[in-house]
Design a protein with these regions (language model features):
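Conserved Rossmann-fold cofactor-binding substructure of NAD(P)-dependent oxidoreductases
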Residues: 2-20, 29
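Short gly/pro/ser/thr-enriched loop/turn and capping motifs at secondary-structure boundaries
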Residues: 50-58, 86-88, 112-118
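Rossmann-fold NAD(P)-binding glycine/threonine-rich loop
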Residues: 47-77
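Short beta->alpha connector loops at strand-helix junctions that form conserved
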Residues: 3, 47-49, 83
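Adenosine-phosphate binding glycine-rich loop
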Residues: 68-114
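C-terminal catalytic/substrate-binding lobe primarily of soluble NAD(P)-dependent oxidoreductases
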Residues: 99-210
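N-terminal Rossmann-like NAD(P) cofactor-binding module of classical short-chain dehydrogenase/reductase
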Residues: 15-24, 44-46
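Helix C-cap/helix->beta junction micro-motif
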Residues: 39-40, 75
Length: 210
């Protein structure tokens, strides 16, 4: 089946009678997929919050929750936003850890992609989205406020048992600090500081370009 993701009707036509519509497209197509899911009465899932609903990405995240959330609820449908590995699995693991804590002051999400391809393949996902992510200011939740930082800064070094060498993690624009800042008291034991730091082949490739 050939589907034109630029056309909501094309998506809806292909999605008739499906239970769950999974959106793995570049972020700009998210409005079409969400609207198609509502039209055909399908549950919805994506891997990262879209940038397409507002000029500022944080506003776009809020739009998905605040505007589309009630639409799916009214239709008796579930919409899951940001359910990849990061964001997604890493968020679930962080939330699960809260049951072992009385309070939480700081969260550091550290992601290292230690796999390197034998051929030139700088990113495992959309190059367009990746290069945009790699070049924009990062998000950090510091002292209870969401702020922006220069990418590739505020480095920290780690050498865990599973690593063959010491790895340098640095600032990278990602969803997690934004997500955790939405309901810090309710879901993250009152956390005041959240950072996301990234390392691996993608960062090594993109840093000189920045």
């Amino acid at each position: 089946v050939l589907v034109d993701a630029r056309n909501k009707d094309s998506i809806a036509s292909a999605a008739r009678d499906v239970f769950l519509l999974v959106n793995a497209l570049p972020l700009s197509f998210t409005p079409n997929v969400m609207d198609a899911a509502l039209e055909v009465g399908a549950h919805y899932q994506d891997y990262a919050a879209s940038t397409a609903f507002a000029k500022e990405w944080v506003d776009s995240i809020h739009y998905q929750f605040d505007v589309y959330g009630p639409k799916f609820e009214k239709a008796g449908l579930l919409a899951l936003i940001g359910t990849g590995s990061a964001p997604g699995l890493i968020c679930a693991a962080t939330r699960d850890a809260m049951r072992y804590l009385d309070t939480c002051e700081s969260i550091r999400n550290l992601v290292w992609e230690g796999i390197e391809a034998k051929r030139f393949q700088p990113f495992w996902w959309s190059p367009e989205v990746a290069l945009e992510d790699m070049s924009e200011l990062s998000y950090a939740y510091i002292d209870g406020k969401l702020i922006r930082r220069e990418p590739y800064t505020h480095e920290i070094k780690r050498h865990y048992d599973s690593m063959s060498r010491e790895i340098t993690f640095a600032e990278h624009s990602h969803d997690e600090p934004v997500y955790y800042s939405l309901h810090p008291e309710e879901y993250f034991k009152g956390v005041k500081n959240v950072v996301f730091k990234y390392a691996g082949a993608g960062m090594d490739f993109a840093k000189p370009l920045y």
